[in-house]
Amino acid sequence: MKIAVDAMGGDYAPDEIVKGIELARDAYPDLEFLLYGQTAKVQPLLQNTTRIELVDAPEVIAMEDEPVRAVRRKKQSSIVLAATAVREGQADAFFSAGNTGAVLAAGLLIIGRIKGIERPGLTTTLPVLQRPDQSSFVMLDVGANADTKPFNVVQYAIMGQYYAQSVMHVDNPRIGLLNNGTEADKGDMAHRAIHDALANMAEINFVGNVESRELLNGAADVVVTDGFTGNATLKAVEGTALSMLKLIKGEIMSGGLGGKIGASMLKPVFRQVRSAMDYSQYGGAVLLGLKAPVVKTHGSTKAETVKNTIGQIQELLASHSADQLGTYFAEHSDEMAALKENLKA
């Protein structure tokens, strides 16, 4: 298995990307890497080139670049060349910590969608804090599509089910629809239509509507939503977690000697909470619905997160989930067409 890597994307690129790839190379002996970046900057950072091939990419798509325009114009950028390697069969998956929009655009325009999938969904893994039998759940779409139709969300449920089964190893994943209440008639017309469609799909273990306050309590294994709501929810969850940790730390520091003594006794608890909320252990966000895995991590990614994300990509490749999705949508093309028409009505 070979992974095409954008070495120039991210706040700490190329240093932390290269370190992370070398950690991943040592951790996963079955993997090889095509590292795309500016040779003059990347070459001096490589300590050991075993199973790592550096490919010169003289152009860089910056975080502030307009995504689609940059992908179309910067043909020699690390993002475009890495995605092209996947399209041409030189690599099996694409990894980047760079410009999110450009990574998504490269995935769509260069690698391409699985036939039958109208819009790929960006999928992320989040922690579950209140269930001993469940450590995490996946949510999609978290930002690939700001304008999403009900039919797209129904397809997200199918894609999320396959991801949970093949990568997270959940036998019969519970699928929930993010909504403003748990009752079946909650939400606008679009959400009610999505709810009814999912409830009538025998192959989906649909548990109904899920409220955002119950996400981290393990209300479902897969939560589906439109890209705008999903992205806002993801940022709210991450921001709230960081704010709470800062609040607790501030109260401890202002509590004098007694507060500091109490904090020292609770250190193991704080460490567990911080670890549970640390996104780096869950890898990156996967653009589900493409012909090959495309995985995007936070721009602030460092070496350990890179390594963990590569492990996630290895699971994706080993599961052949893209092939499974392709087979499903090919075999159910008539049902999908009928469902799309029903949801338009």
Curated annotation (Swiss-Prot):
It comes from the Bacteria. It catalyses: a fatty acyl-[ACP] + phosphate = an acyl phosphate + holo-[ACP]. GO terms for cellular component: cytoplasm. Pathway: Lipid metabolism; phospholipid metabolism. Its main location: cytoplasm. SUPFAM superfamilies: Isocitrate/Isopropylmalate dehydrogenase-like (SSF53659). Pfam families: FA_synthesis. The keyword tRNA-binding does not apply. GO terms for biological process: fatty acid biosynthetic process; phospholipid biosynthetic process. Keywords: Cytoplasm, Lipid biosynthesis, Lipid metabolism, Phospholipid biosynthesis, Phospholipid metabolism, Transferase. It is found in: Cytoplasm. GO terms for molecular function: phosphate:acyl-[acyl carrier protein] acyltransferase activity. Its EC number is 2.3.1.274. Homodimer. Probably interacts with PlsY. Catalyzes the reversible formation of acyl-phosphate (acyl-PO(4)) from acyl-[acyl-carrier-protein] (acyl-ACP). This enzyme utilizes acyl-ACP as fatty acyl donor, but not acyl-CoA. HAMAP family: PlsX (MF_00019). PANTHER family: FATTY ACID/PHOSPHOLIPID SYNTHESIS PROTEIN PLSX, PHOSPHATE ACYLTRANSFERASE. Belongs to the PlsX family. This is Phosphate acyltransferase. The lineage of its organism: Bacteria, Bacillati, Bacillota, Bacilli, Lactobacillales.
